[in-house]
Design a protein with these regions (language model features):
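Conserved phosphate- and dinucleotide-binding cores of soluble alpha/beta proteins
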Residues: 2-5, 12, 21-25, 30, ...
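HTH-adjacent hinge/linker in prokaryotic transcriptional regulators
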Residues: 2-6, 15-23, 27-28, 34-99, ...
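Glycine- and other small-residue-rich loops at beta-strand/loop junctions that grip anionic moieties
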Residues: 74, 95, 117, 148, ...
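Alpha-helix C-terminal capping segments
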Residues: 86-89, 106-111, 227, 232-239
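Short beta-strand scaffold positions
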Residues: 97-98, 119, 228
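Catalytic core of membrane glycerolipid acyltransferases/transacylases, capturing the structured
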Residues: 108-111, 115-124
Length: 244
């Protein structure tokens, strides 16, 4: 479900002020309080916000929790990453697409007809299901409501039965020449998928460089390509194949 322009404005206001009342939002956007309440209910169902008495606030770790939030964050940068990646996508018949919004941005732009596409993310599966002639496989497992993704031992075991031509994925952070995740569950799923793919492409916008991640996934040099929109000047790229 896409956000309306008004809901995007609500999200921007909450990013600035952290918490706002229905009355203030209604006055600021020149609509009725009933309209704002409907917007907030929809946004709460997406995992974008939390409702408070008479208003709304951003959830803790909002950037990690919701794919809808992540799709809105740095949207233009993610579009640039996707655009940069398209000419470098190798021929493939099967692909694993992780739960990242950046990988989804690319998947929406490439031809997936007559391809096998496997993902652990509900929203990614929904978007890809709109394409024609795709053999789409959604992995099962413990589904996290906010992230819309399946993780856990069962999900990992399913991945072990595949051999993919290609993996399109992102990460939470790039630190010291390595990819990191904030969630151990996401890290474990990506690690298993990584081991069952022939070609691996990492998609990261420049804000991921120097960001914080707790769980180390792998060295950037282990990827066939690292696609970004801009490389910060202090990043050592001598052993890594960047596209930007």
């Amino acid at each position: 479900m896409a956000l309306t322009e008004r809901q995007k404005d609500i999200l921007k206001s909450l990013k600035t002020y952290k918490k706002l009342s229905v009355k203030k939002l209604a006055n600021g956007l020149f609509v009725s309080e009933a309209t704002i309440r409907r917007d907030l209910s929809e946004m709460q169902n997406m995992g974008l916000i939390e409702r408070s008495h008479g208003g709304a606030l951003l959830p803790e770790n909002a950037e990690e929790v919701s794919i809808f939030f992540r799709m809105e964050k740095n949207a233009s940068e993610k579009e640039k990453v996707a655009t940069n990646a398209i000419p470098h996508i190798p021929a493939f018949k099967s692909v694993f697409i992780d739960s990242s919004s950046t990988a989804l941005a690319l998947a929406e732009r490439i031809d997936l007809s007559h391809k096998t596409v496997v993902t652990n993310n509900l929203q990614t599966a929904i978007q890809i299901s709109k394409k024609n002639n795709v053999n789409l496989i959604l992995l099962g497992g413990n589904v996290h409501f906010n992230t819309n993704s399946a993780t856990g031992a069962w999900t990992a075991r399913q991945l072990e039965d595949f051999s993919f031509d290609l993996m399109l994925s992102s990460c939470a952070a790039v630190q010291g020449g390595a990819a990191f995740e904030r969630s151990i569950e996401q890290k474990e799923i990506k690690k298993v998928a990584f081991e069952h793919c022939q070609k691996k492409i990492l998609l990261v916008d420049h804000t991921k460089f120097g960001a914080h991640g707790t769980y180390r996934l792998t060295d950037l040099a282990a990827y066939d390509l690292v696609v970004t929109d801009f490389i910060p000047p202090d990043v050592n790229n001598s052993k890594i194949k960047y596209i930007y």
